[in-house]
Amino acid sequence: MKTISAKPETVKRDWYVIDATDKTLGRLSTEIARRLRGKHKAEYTPHVDTGDYIVVVNAEKVRVTGNKAQDKMYYRHTGYPGGLKEMSFDKLIQHAPERVIETAVKGMMPRNPLGRAMLKKLKVYASAEHPHTAQQPIELKI
């Protein structure tokens, strides 16, 4: 009996919507990363993108524990000398709440072309509205 290996053209991808209201950032991100990679499926194959599409709503209501709201810093560089910018979790959640979840999930994905392709299936929105109703996403409780 041969081992079944998933092929890119035979992979079935579902759409899921996750409400991030009052969810812990790390616990939410690990489940999102797992489903983007397809590790929850029986036909998971490491070299094939078998993951599902994930739509995250209410990103502005995600929580962190302890003092991380003030202490956790996010860094970016403008590309100019001395252009290192930093922003705390509190400020970033007000400025760009989508980036908090995107950054957390990106750190859990493979750092190669396949990981970047998997990350494109993540759609994060600050509020409860999203433009993916035509895909009929299934609500996922985490």
From Swiss-Prot:
<dbReference type="GO" id="GO:0003729">
    <property type="term" value="F:mRNA binding"/>
</dbReference>
<dbReference type="GO" id="GO:0006412">
    <property type="term" value="P:translation"/>
</dbReference>
<protein>
    <recommendedName>
        <fullName>Large ribosomal subunit protein uL13</fullName>
    </recommendedName>
</protein>
<dbReference type="GO" id="GO:0022625">
    <property type="term" value="C:cytosolic large ribosomal subunit"/>
</dbReference>
<dbReference type="Pfam" id="PF00572">
    <property type="entry name" value="Ribosomal_L13"/>
</dbReference>
<keyword id="KW-0689">Ribosomal protein</keyword>
<dbReference type="InterPro" id="IPR036899">
    <property type="entry name" value="Ribosomal_uL13_sf"/>
</dbReference>
<keyword id="KW-0687">Ribonucleoprotein</keyword>
<comment type="function">
    <text>This protein is one of the early assembly proteins of the 50S ribosomal subunit, although it is not seen to bind rRNA by itself. It is important during the early stages of 50S assembly.</text>
</comment>
<dbReference type="InterPro" id="IPR005822">
    <property type="entry name" value="Ribosomal_uL13"/>
</dbReference>
<dbReference type="GO" id="GO:0017148">
    <property type="term" value="P:negative regulation of translation"/>
</dbReference>
<dbReference type="GO" id="GO:0003735">
    <property type="term" value="F:structural constituent of ribosome"/>
</dbReference>
<dbReference type="InterPro" id="IPR005823">
    <property type="entry name" value="Ribosomal_uL13_bac-type"/>
</dbReference>
<comment type="similarity">
    <text>Belongs to the universal ribosomal protein uL13 family.</text>
</comment>
<comment type="subunit">
    <text>Part of the 50S ribosomal subunit.</text>
</comment>
